[in-house]
Amino acid sequence: MAAKRISSTVKRPQAAVDVSAYWWDLDQWPRSWMGIEQDRPPGEQLLPHFRRFIEHLASSSLSPKTIRNHVDNLWSLGGEIIRDLHYDKTLRKLPAERLLRQSVHELGGSAIHNGSDDQQRSFDSTCRKLHRFLEP
């Protein structure tokens, strides 16, 4: 007769996650998004929201590759938000958090510029996850 395996119920502390590996270039994102100098401040205002979300992802059970995909999609989301500022000048008056909340919803995000169907699906997945994170 085979011996029964008993699973341990001991909770072991998890090692601290070094989130800087996921955002090593985050401070450069606003410059990469900007078309004109006016684009940099709203881009910089998005970064604290992105950092908190990346910290949340890093503390989850997601694999590093999945987290990196979400981080890449955040970069795309920031670029799409800044692009929208050029089409609707009234958006420049809104705080970054509101721009971010308007850009993501329970179904995903807006259509990404020149993105494939696979890229759009991945982007929408990140936007849905970010939407749930931002919900009170």
Where are these regions (language model features)?
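Charge-rich, intrinsically disordered N-terminal extensions
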Residues: M1-P136
